[in-house]
Amino acid sequence: MLEIFDVNHTLLSETKSGELFTLRKETFKDRLNWAVQCTDGMEFDQYDNNNTTYLFGIKDNTVICSLRFIETKYPNMITGTFFPYFKEINIPEGNYLESSRFFVDKSRAKDILGNEYPISSMLFLSMINYSKDKGYDGIYTIVSHPMLTILKRSGWGIRVVEQGLSEKEERVYLVFLPVDDENQEALARRINRSGTFMSNELKQWPLRVPAAIAQA
């Protein structure tokens, strides 16, 4: 059974936090060479706190993918770490989430789920499902140009709000991710083009997909 679900930072076990922060170090420091702080082989920062909720994709008790949500009324990476990258950032008041630290461990995904399973798109859809379930109005995030391309290809009707430059002089984008019924249906339909999944299963929260179906 592949499961994607939410866990608040206050409820995160020491074992799972260690696994998560180790995978984040391997992704953001070792592979992407981002300017992140690492301690004892793990990557975590001041935004990993009691205001944080994580989405986990787990199969056989193994973390495959994850991301971090913080309500925009709290300190977050858009208004903190990434703020100097942009000439102007204006996040509207409202019931919005900030998303960061999105990753998929490609080697784990391949070994456990196979090559045909659309895990990135599944995590995108889970962001919508979670937001709708909890009553949020949308998601803001900062992405690189390659990640922007992946988001556009997913079928999600995203909107670029601002463009900036990172510390490495690379383009980065402040993006709004809508969480309405139309975008939920668009992502679910694209994921299920082969008819592998039950359509109603894809729109549930938490998201649970039987392993036999996931590997079909």
UniProtKB/Swiss-Prot annotation:
A Pfam family of the record is Autoind_synth
For the biological process aspect of GO, one term held by this record is: quorum sensing
Q: Which transformation does this protein catalyse, written as a reaction? A: a fatty acyl-[ACP] + S-adenosyl-L-methionine = an N-acyl-L-homoserine lactone + S-methyl-5'-thioadenosine + holo-[ACP] + H(+)
GO MF entries: N-acyl homoserine lactone synthase activity
- Alphabetical keyword list: Antibiotic biosynthesis, Autoinducer synthesis, Quorum sensing, S-adenosyl-L-methionine, Transferase
Signal sequence, start to end = none
EC number annotated for this UniProt entry:
2.3.1.184
Kindly give the PROSITE patterns that the UniProt entry links to this protein.
AUTOINDUCER_SYNTH_1, AUTOINDUCER_SYNTH_2
What top-tier enzyme class does this entry carry? transferase
Q: Domain of life of the organism in this record?
A: Bacteria
Q: Does the keyword Transferase apply?
A: yes
Q: What does this protein do?
A: Required for the synthesis of OHHL (N-(3-oxohexanoyl)-L-homoserine lactone), an autoinducer molecule which binds to CarR and thus acts in the control of the biosynthesis of carbapenem antibiotics.
Q: Which family does it belong to?
A: Belongs to the autoinducer synthase family.
Q: What is this protein's record name?
A: Acyl-homoserine-lactone synthase
Native organism is Pectobacterium carotovorum subsp. carotovorum
Task: Name the lineage.
Answer: Bacteria, Pseudomonadati, Pseudomonadota, Gammaproteobacteria, Enterobacterales
